[in-house]
Amino acid sequence: MIVIFVGLAGVLGALMRFGLDSFFAQRGRFAHGQAHHFPLATLSVNVLGSFIIGLAGGFASHAELSPDWHSAISIGIAGGLTTFSSFAVATVSLWQLGNKFSAMVNIGLNLVLGLGAAWLGLSLAA
């Protein structure tokens, strides 16, 4: 049963990611597939996912969240939402297009904001 629960949560995470990608694409600033633009949608889903998994981990460490719910949220929702591969491809594409500064900023922001969001989630759940 947990497998189905995690799978359904993964669908929710993927739909959340699609929604955020669509939000940025509709504004015309970061159109899908245009690597020369800063990948703000990818940054957003990775930071949000880091916060969600931090929050879930914090609640699970205090036994306020069952292992099944922790798996559904961490593996399903956060796993379906976040994307390391898109981050990697966008960063390499920026670099190859000569936008080395943007590529480095993307790496820095994903690390700093992602770690900060995970810390915030863990702290709020404490």
Swiss-Prot record:
Q: Which organism is it from?
A: Renibacterium salmoninarum (strain ATCC 33209 / DSM 20767 / JCM 11484 / NBRC 15589 / NCIMB 2235)
- Chain ranges passing through the membrane: 1-21, 40-60, 72-92, 104-124
Source organism phylogeny? Bacteria, Bacillati, Actinomycetota, Actinomycetes, Micrococcales
Record-level GO BP terms? cellular detoxification of fluoride
Q: Where does this polypeptide localize?
A: Cell membrane
Q: How is its activity regulated?
A: Na(+) is not transported, but it plays an essential structural role and its presence is essential for fluoride channel function.
For membrane topology, the record states:
Multi-pass membrane protein
PANTHER family given for it? FLUORIDE EXPORT PROTEIN 1-RELATED
Q: At which positions is Na(+) bound?
A: G79, T82
* UniProt name for this protein: Fluoride-specific ion channel FluC
